[in-house]
Amino acid sequence: MFEQCRDHIQITACDGTSLVYHQRTYAFLLFGVLTHYLRWPPERAERHVAERMDNEIPPTSVDAVGNSHDGVYHQAMLLAYGEGYWWEDNEYNSAEPADFDAWWCRYTAQHGLEGDFIEFL
């Protein structure tokens, strides 16, 4: 799953700043949020995440920083419900669930993923 993605991608921006992007970890985290919190079937979640990740091959610093700025939960909700899902007149809650950090730690450990998906150097 997510063979097009890999971890430990070093990216240097135009201004010379560098980061390490764990794109495979990020893809699996999106998949995990969609299947765990939204109860999407794995096939549906995999298809949506793979399509999204295809748009950042090869990944840029803008992709990595943008993903880290909004967070995995928010990005998964965008993938599921689209832009504006957090507006008050929608039924979707934009807040991370109370158990999100604990879930993240368990999920990354269970699946042999990096602890986070971005490292600023």
What are these regions (language model features)?
Residues M1-L121:
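C-terminal alpha-helical interaction appendages
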